[in-house]
Amino acid sequence: MAALIRAAMAAALVFAATLAGAQGAAPPDTPAAPAKHVMLFISDGASWGTWHMASYYEHGALGHQPYDAFSVKLGMTTVPLNTSSVPTGNTTRTVSYDPARAWDTTPLAGQLGGRPHHFAGYEYLRRDATDSAAAATALASGTKTYNGAINHDNLGRALTYATQRAKARGQATGVLTSVPFSHATPAAFGAQSASRNSYGAISEQMLANPALDLIMGAGHPLFDADGRPRSSPDHRYVSAAAWAALQGPASPRTLVQTRADFEALALGQLQPRLPLLGLVQVHDTLQANRNVAVVGANPGLPSGAATIPGVPTLATMTRGALQLLGHQPKGFFMMVEGGAVDWMAHANNTARVIEEQMDFNHAVQAAVDWVHTHSHWGESLIIVLTDHGNGMPMGPGSDRVPFEPIRNHGQGVLPGVRWHHGSHSNENTLLWAHGQGAQQLLQAAQTVDPALVSRLGHNRDGRTLTNADVARVLVPAP
């Protein structure tokens, strides 16, 4: 089987070379002007099946998401430089992605973490995965590094990242997330740290960062996971010093906290001064970690749990950010993360993965609507991707049928899913892009994975790039 896949890969390479313009790629010697407005959407930890299960639940079919109509569709590999958790002092890559091994359907005995391998490809995909810090660093800086690094390379040097480059170009900047803003992915767009776990120091760095005009996310020290006031502060994600600095007239940022204020921002009814921190009144996730015993039931939602009433949606936050950044004369760069998709994928919680992915999809729709209303695709770029897979969700028979897709049970019904892992996976992920500069991603896609076509139906030629390639297109150096 591996030999057949390698033969198919060779054929696909010839096909891709012949059809270099299959997705409308511009000639390599025609540099595109950078987009005025750049929006990067990251559904953290979204394996192929994650995108599909949310579409099946919400729409009963694939093809109805805002990014499904985008002009550029690519694969994106996510492996780190190495799997060390500390810098090893060199630039040698020790891990890679091999399509032939990733899609190998040879039956395989054995197990990892109590889960059977089933097939050689599954076993391969469970190994050598990136963490969110290294993945986000590659997306933000263009440099592969060790797991755990926030804009630090494997030699221990601090790296320039996307919001710094955007600010140097005169653009406004924003970072939004459904998890604490000091967590790995948002941190990589506003901080530099040898370790992702230094949440308090990262929060202080981000809040004082002149390259960040707007920050929105969770991590509120005074509220718990269900949005209830705490008896004493929890400063895990926002340090006591950072929180103290936000109080009073000398605060480094305008502070927005209530759902009502986030909704007023989204409607343009509130115009606070930048820089701004939108700190949602919840501790770790917007909604993903809520307890049904506290919030009550809502059978109309996938999980059956009502939502926390005082918490805005990621889509509302996105609209609010666009109200504040969208009128800046030189444009803006904005990163929006559906971070809790990853948290729920670690738990293999199908219903809550779907809820989080749906909220993420609605945030993308808000940005597309903004482009149609306030801008145009000749000056705006939207990229939708994940930083890595997580959980390897496939169809219910995928223990017998290799790579069986998620099974559609119709709109409003949980799809058929079998999870094969409880952590990150080394898979070729899915990317969509549209607007000014999207064609440059095609030019950066120098490898081919035939299964993007044959198994996933994602694009027409299997073209694939790396996460570091995306960074080089995202915000060019001024």
Task: For every predicted segment, state its role.
Residues 26-34:
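Acidic, polar low-complexity linker/tail segments
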Residues 143:
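RNA-binding basic/glycine-rich loop and surface signature characteristic of RAMP-family CRISPR effectors
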Residues 162-164, 168-187:
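Glycine-rich phosphate/pyrophosphate-binding loops
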Residues 153-158:
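Glycine-rich anion/phosphate-binding loops
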Residues 35-38, 43-130, 135-137, 178, ...:
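A post-motif C-terminal structural segment
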Residues 17-19:
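N-terminal signal peptide c-region/cleavage motif recognized by signal peptidases
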Residues 1-9:
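Bacterial N-terminal signal peptides that target proteins for export
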